[in-house]
Structure formats: C-alpha cells, structure tokens
From Swiss-Prot:
Designated gene of the protein: thiG
Subunit composition and interactions: Homotetramer. Forms heterodimers with either ThiH or ThiS.
Function field: Catalyzes the rearrangement of 1-deoxy-D-xylulose 5-phosphate (DXP) to produce the thiazole phosphate moiety of thiamine. Sulfur is provided by the thiocarboxylate moiety of the carrier protein ThiS. In vitro, sulfur can be provided by H(2)S.
Family according to the record: Belongs to the ThiG family.
Source organism: Pseudomonas putida (strain W619)
Pathway note: Cofactor biosynthesis; thiamine diphosphate biosynthesis
Catalytic reaction list: [ThiS sulfur-carrier protein]-C-terminal-Gly-aminoethanethioate + 2-iminoacetate + 1-deoxy-D-xylulose 5-phosphate = [ThiS sulfur-carrier protein]-C-terminal Gly-Gly + 2-[(2R,5Z)-2-carboxy-4-methylthiazol-5(2H)-ylidene]ethyl phosphate + 2 H2O + H(+)
Pfam family, one: ThiG
Residues binding 1-deoxy-D-xylulose 5-phosphate: G167, A193, G194, N215, S216
UniProt-listed Enzyme Commission number(s): 2.8.1.10
Keyword Cytoplasm found: yes
Superkingdom of source: Bacteria
EC top class, as a word: transferase
Subcellular location(s) per record: Cytoplasm
Designated name of the protein: Thiazole synthase
C-alpha cells in the first residue's frame, strides 16, 4: 500500500534519539524536582536558558549540569531572554565555550516581554550568522509558513513553530498554518510553546510533527513528575496514531457489524 507510513529515526545534527519529547528546565520548584520530572519524561534532549542558568559560568553556585549530566542528556542551550540578533549570537557563542565546543543550539529572539512572540526579522538575521559560524540551529519561530521556509533555506536544521504563546497552555491555536509548514518543510518540524496538557502533545504528533518541546506544561502541573510521565506516553501515542493513519471522518453513521445474516 503506497499510503502506509513507516517510522524513521528522529535525527538531529547527525545524532539519533529514541524520545521525541524535548523538555525545558525552568519554572520548577528546585533542582531535585527538575531532575525527577525530566527522568520521568524519558527525554534525551534538555534545553537550558544560558542567560538564566548556571552551566559553570558562576563558580560556587548550584550548577544544573550536576543534576543533568551531559553524558546522559544532550544539552540544548537556548537564547531565551534575547531581543535582538546580536544578543542571540553572543549567547550561543558563550554556550559553545561553556559546553566545550557544543554546536547544537536553540535560537529564539523575542519581540516583547508581554507576548514573547518571536521577532522573525531578528531571528532570521541571527540564524544566518550562526549557520555561517558552524552552529546546528534549531529555531523557534511563528507559525508563518513563509518564515519557516526562509529559516530552513538559511540552513537551520529544524524549525520550531509555536503552537500558542509561551507559557499559555492554549494548545495548537492555528492547526492550519502548522499543517502547511509540515507539508512544505524539508527539515524536521517540532512544536515549541503553547502545549498545556497531554492531548495537545498527542495532536501535534498526530499531525506529523517530528517531536514536541515543552516546559510550562510539565513544570506548572499540579504534579509535575506525573505530568512528565503522561507527556512521555502522549508523544508515543501520537506518533503511533500518525503512522497508523486515522479513519476518515464521515457525516453519517456506519454500522460496525454487517447487516446480512441478521437473526429474524
């Protein structure tokens, strides 16, 4: 059957990962809760805000890498808190120094503090510089299919359109734009931001996303560790449903059992 989907490995920057759930490290009560939640999530890629997290640049303070060791997790430094391309590029270069030449980064350049919406003009500028500088750039962007295409053409290895605004938990607000991005993209598409609960993650995966990145949905849950485990299963279920192919929607009913041979 030509329309049967077969699974393929989730690969970024030449590395293959088993988990399609990426998680952030902010907003937890303490480092122990961070550790427990990330363990429960099964995530292999953990994103860290370089400007807000001690990765060794502040000796004598708690170091996140002590509870999330780089030999167990792939650390994905991000540029959260940057509002222009210059800041973002500087932050990525700092991360590379702190992580011994690590080139995989998550680029985000924000427009304002109220919406945390991406500034796509500055994002594109930063992406072009970082790619030339040898970085493997995963990029947070709007759900504009044209911008997503331009970022991929600039050399980003993955585009990460928002489902909803960061920290809102609103779920996928514009599935139609996301579907266009998924159909057109030649690089992996990961939903980033806006996920609120397990069903949101499942829907993103059912649509065909390669993976989902989240932080607030787990950290702000009443029981973060339990929600982390729920998200692990949600991602797997969504991927399996995508591969299986859902039944077509119909307006009218269709009996599950055959009508011939009924007992009279």
């Amino acid at each position: 059957m030509s329309n049967v989907r077969s699974d393929k490995p989730f690969t970024l920057a030449g590395r293959t990962f088993q988990s399609r759930l990426l998680v952030g490290t902010g907003k937890y009560r303490d480092m122990e809760e961070t550790r427990l939640a990330i363990e429960a999530s099964g995530a292999e890629i953990v994103t860290v805000a370089v400007r807000r997290t001690n990765l060794g640049q502040n000796p004598g303070e708690p170091n996140l890498l002590d509870v999330l060791p780089p030999d167990r997790y792939t650390i994905l430094p991000n540029t959260a808190g940057c509002y222009d391309a210059v800041e973002a590029v500087r932050t990525c270069r700092l991360a590379r120094e702190l992580l011994d030449g690590h080139n995989l980064v998550k680029l985000e350049v924000l427009a304002d503090q109220k919406t945390l919406f991406p500034n796509v003009i500055e994002t594109l500028k930063a992406a072009e510089v970082l790619v030339k500088d040898g970085f493997d750039v995963m990029v947070y962007t709007s759900d504009d299919p044209i911008i997503a295409r331009q970022l991929a053409e600039a050399g980003c290895i993955a585009v990460m359109p928002l489902a909803g605004l960061i920290g809102t938990g609103l779920g996928i607000c514009n599935p139609y734009n996301l579907q266009i991005i998924l159909e057109e993209s030649k690089v992996p598409v990961l939903v980033d931001a806006g996920v609120g609960t397990a069903s949101d993650a499942t829907i993103a995966m059912e649509m065909g996303c390669e993976a989902v990145l989240m932080n607030s949905a787990i950290a702000h849950a009443q029981q973060p560790v339990l929600m982390a485990e729920a998200m692990k299963h949600a991602i797997v279920a969504g991927r399996m449903a995508y591969l299986a192919g859902r039944m077509p929607k119909k307006l009218y009913a269709s009996a599950s059992s055959p009508l011939d041979g009924l007992i009279k």
